[in-house]
């Protein structure tokens, strides 16, 4: 690769360092760096962010009316070549702190008033980022509903989901993801960094998840 280093942004919804989700995201970041890229691992539980208040159309020409730790997240997502979202499954969806972060990204494809007076959701940047979801849950539970939330979020921030890496386990041990799963996560990070950007989608026309 030539030019500026490509950036992988890992959004971590796990409450615990050393958890399977945390380890998988660390591995994805390692793979991205080994491929010559940069990686930023953002832990949602460490952020101080306010909840979305549904402020409506034309709220601000910037991102959000609030200025908190989300300002850094917006800047990273705008620069990102690839995005990996990781979360355990809590009540069929992502963890609460990650959901706060996701909701606050509504302003990346905000509701705006168009020249003819109608309103529509218009993305602030093109959908060129490749993306993936990593998760961990019991073998007795499903993760597809959490994946659906993540895929919708990725579309909203100019990224396209390409795969899910799921560690479904029967134990209750912290960080039990096996070496084979960690190797797959490293390969995921490498692939995302080495892959070319997606062809830009025409602004204002959101394609399917």
Predicted regions and their residues:
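N-terminal beta1-alpha1-beta2 submodule of the flavodoxin-like/Rossmannoid cofactor-binding fold
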Residues: 1-110, 175, 179-209
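Short beta-strands and strand-loop turn motifs
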Residues: 11-12, 86, 133-136, 165
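Short loop/turn motifs at secondary-structure junctions
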Residues: 38, 79, 127, 160-161
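Glycine-rich beta-alpha junction loops
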Residues: 48, 138, 168-171
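Short, well-ordered, mixed-charge alpha-helical segments that flank or form enzyme active sites
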Residues: 93, 140-143, 173
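Short, glycine-/small-residue-rich phosphate/pyrophosphate-handling segment
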Residues: 110-160
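Beta-strand-loop-alpha "switch" segments that mediate conformational coupling across diverse proteins
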Residues: 162-168
């Amino acid at each position: 690769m030539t030019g500026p280093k490509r950036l992988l942004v890992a959004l971590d919804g796990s409450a615990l360092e050393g958890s399977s989700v945390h380890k998988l995201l660390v591995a994805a970041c390692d793979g991205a760096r080994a491929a010559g890229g940069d990686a930023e691992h953002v832990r949602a539980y460490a952020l101080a962010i306010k909840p979305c208040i549904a402020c409506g159309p034309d709220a601000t020409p910037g991102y959000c009316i609030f200025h908190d730790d989300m300002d850094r997240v917006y800047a990273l997502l705008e620069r990102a070549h690839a995005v990996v979202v990781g979360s355990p499954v809590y009540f069929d969806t992502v963890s609460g702190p990650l959901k706060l972060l996701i909701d606050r990204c509504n302003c990346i494809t905000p509701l705006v008033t168009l020249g003819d007076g109608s309103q529509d959701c218009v993305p602030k940047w093109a959908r060129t980022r490749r993306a993936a979801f990593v998760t961990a849950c019991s073998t007795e539970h499903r993760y597809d509903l959490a994946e659906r939330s993540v895929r919708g979020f990725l579309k909203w921030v100019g990224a396209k989901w390409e795969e899910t890496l799921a560690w479904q386990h029967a134990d209750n041990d912290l960080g039990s993801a096996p070496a084979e799963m960690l190797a797959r996560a490293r390969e995921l990070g490498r692939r995302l960094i080495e892959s070319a950007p997606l062809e830009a989608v025409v602004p204002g026309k959101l394609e399917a998840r």
